[in-house]
């Protein structure tokens, strides 16, 4: 594989963190929307009627959806924490500390390039150049992991 392809493998791995974080944010947004719907609706309390079929109580149905989404969010947060811990351990295999800082800032802390550049007192252009080198070093430092991952993808 070319250096560009190796770097892309590293980027694809890192993308999982951002995608999982976005999914968590979307699920939280859905919960917030459902909760606001609960407070904006008026529910009329009536004695229970016996029906052979029909819709459940909308309040109960919405609460069940919220609880289910909150369980999903908790599971995804646990998954994200594990991914970040694993990734942090893998980043330690990059020998250059500036490159480590860039990878941590971008992929674990999910910062933008300008913020990373300001924190490191580098120009954004230099950060991007170091980032390219860091991706390649990340792949090389974790080559066995990526080879197993590629093999599993090909077999699955």
Residue ranges: model-predicted function:
Residues 1-90, 136, 140-156:
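N-terminal interaction/assembly modules
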Residues 60, 79, 101, 124-126:
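Coiled-coil-like amphipathic alpha-helices with heptad-repeat character
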Residues 83-86, 97-99, 130:
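N-terminal positioning helix adjacent to the helix-turn-helix/winged-helix DNA-binding module
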Residues 91, 95-98, 126:
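Short coil/turn residues that cap or connect secondary-structure elements
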Residues 95-111:
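Short amphipathic alpha helix immediately N-terminal
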Residues 115-118:
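Short alpha-helical "recognition helix" segments of helix-turn-helix
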Residues 121-141:
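DNA-recognition helix of helix-turn-helix
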